[in-house]
Amino acid sequence: APQTVYEWTADVAVRFLKEWNFLLGIILLFITIILQFGYTSRSMFIYVVKMIILWLMWPLTIVLCIFNCVYALNNVYLGFSIVFTIVSIVMWIMYFVNSIRLFIRTGSWWSFNPETNNLMCIDVKGTVYVRPIIEDYHTLTATNVRGHLYMQGVKLGTGFSLSDLPAYVTVAKVSHLCTYKRAFLDKVDGVSGFAVYVKSKVGNYRLPSNKPSGVDTALLRI
């Protein structure tokens, strides 16, 4: 029996939108809210959902580009579809390469964050906290509010004091590591205050391991 050939026409597109318009609207509204309010300083859970959505964009784009290649309307569409497919695959590979390089430098799964390649690293009481930051800041601010420690507005934990803040904070990138030196510390009252860290050094380093090994904890060059 001959196979049925499906053609994507304007009437089919209109009928598809009529049937799926409500569901598509809800999905787009959900994605818009997540992208709008997904920040580490607001909700870590929403931010993780946002990262998952952004991460899924690449494979979805590649699948759609390949679909366009298979079902191209004409040679012009086919040519553009092939170019878009190649570009999407190359950019996705570059993302993985950069993420793996950053993971080698920091050892944190935040290295695979699709939004940024800047990872802020702070060692407090022997625990290294790694959090993503969007921009390359010249200064970083640590705030302690009655034992609640925030770094660039991102909450790290509770039960800390200003004396627990380290002398240095680092921001890891794919190609280098930025070191920030504590330049100012001020106590607002007995249990609250803030510290300002200023960028002082940039080099090709990796973070030292926080496991006890008897070696110097200085930054290790790679």
UniProtKB/Swiss-Prot annotation:
Iron found in the keyword field: no
Intravirion side: 41-43, 97-222
Chain positions carrying an annotated carbohydrate: 9
Transmembrane segments: 20-40, 44-64, 76-96
Keyword match Membrane: yes
PTMs per UniProt: O-linked glycans consist of Gal-GalNAc disaccharides which are modified with up to 2 sialic acid residues.
Cellular component annotations (GO), alphabetically ordered: host cell Golgi membrane; membrane; viral envelope; virion membrane
Disulfide partners: none
Membrane association type: Multi-pass membrane protein
Compartment list: Virion membrane; Host Golgi apparatus membrane
CDD domains according to UniProt: HCoV-like_M
Keywords assigned by UniProt, alphabetized: Glycoprotein, Host Golgi apparatus, Host membrane, Membrane, Transmembrane, Transmembrane helix, Viral envelope protein, Viral matrix protein, Virion
GO molecular function: structural constituent of virion
Topological domains annotated Virion surface: 1-19, 65-75
Subunit-structure text: Homomultimer. Interacts with envelope E protein in the budding compartment of the host cell, which is located between endoplasmic reticulum and the Golgi complex. Forms a complex with HE and S proteins. Interacts with nucleocapsid N protein. This interaction probably participates in RNA packaging into the virus.
Family: Belongs to the coronaviruses M protein family.
Role this protein plays: Component of the viral envelope that plays a central role in virus morphogenesis and assembly via its interactions with other viral proteins.
Record's protein name: Membrane protein
Gene name, Swiss-Prot/TrEMBL: M
